[in-house]
Amino acid sequence: LLVKGELISDYKIHIDYPGIKVKKIHKADSPNYLFIDLIISNSTKAGIVKLKFKKEEKELIYDYKLAIKRSKNEQNEGFNSSDVVYLITPDRFANGNYSNDIIKGLKEDRIDRDDNYARHGGDLQGIADNIDYLKDMGFTSLWLNPVLINDMKEGSYHGYATTDYYTVDPRFGTMEDYLNLSTIAEKNNIKLIKDIIVNHCGLYHWWMEDLPFDDWLNFQEIYLNSTDDTIEQNTVYSNHRRSTIQDIYAAKVDYRGMLDGWFVPTMPDL
């Protein structure tokens, strides 16, 4: 578990729940994080686990939901060479719910179908509404560009600048909408491929305000010493020389440029 809270590393954690034990606690460079390794036995029942953090006389309690794990026979079959895969950028496919086109409080607050880099309004409901069309074309798998929230100032339509890894972008819909699409696809013998980006995150991910470790980002020192006005010119960009990863004779500068360089200034390389 990743736990964030003000000076949380000063607290001791206690869990009194049948089948769960704290194996190890890892402190970060920032005092506001704890990384907790848990052992959960196979017989542990689902329920609300109370995480108790104590420091002298002060105690913090957080209710953590332990959900029912899907059994092996419920796990989805992976895609393979027999599949015909259709890649969808959800924002560009179909608008099934006009009420979520603009969400108050998010940084990008416009729809403009005349602008290639603006949002166009497509969503999960739009894909679900057109499942027959996709099936009739013979596709057996749908690969969606990431649908997790991208709360960026611009260019958020593509989904590759995640700002919260646990929240569906509300402009695409809700978790219930995602599960509904999964159910509809399954009923039509269509697989749903989840795309998730862990190489980098969006510039406005919440941990960017308080990085857990001194090496959480590649070229972190350059980022910390940059401002909004200088980040673009200071960024060390990826050279995209992919062959250097396999090339035993590649120059170290080329290897690191590929491995650690940033894609763009708005997507910090993790």
Feature-to-residue mapping (PLM):
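Low-complexity, Pro/Ser/Thr- and charge-rich linker/hinge segments at domain boundaries
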Residues: 66-87, 92, 96
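Substrate-binding/active-site clefts of carbohydrate-active enzymes
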Residues: 93-140, 145-270
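Aromatic sugar-binding surface patches on proteins
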Residues: 28-37
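Edge beta-strands of extracellular beta-sandwich domains
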Residues: 48, 59-68
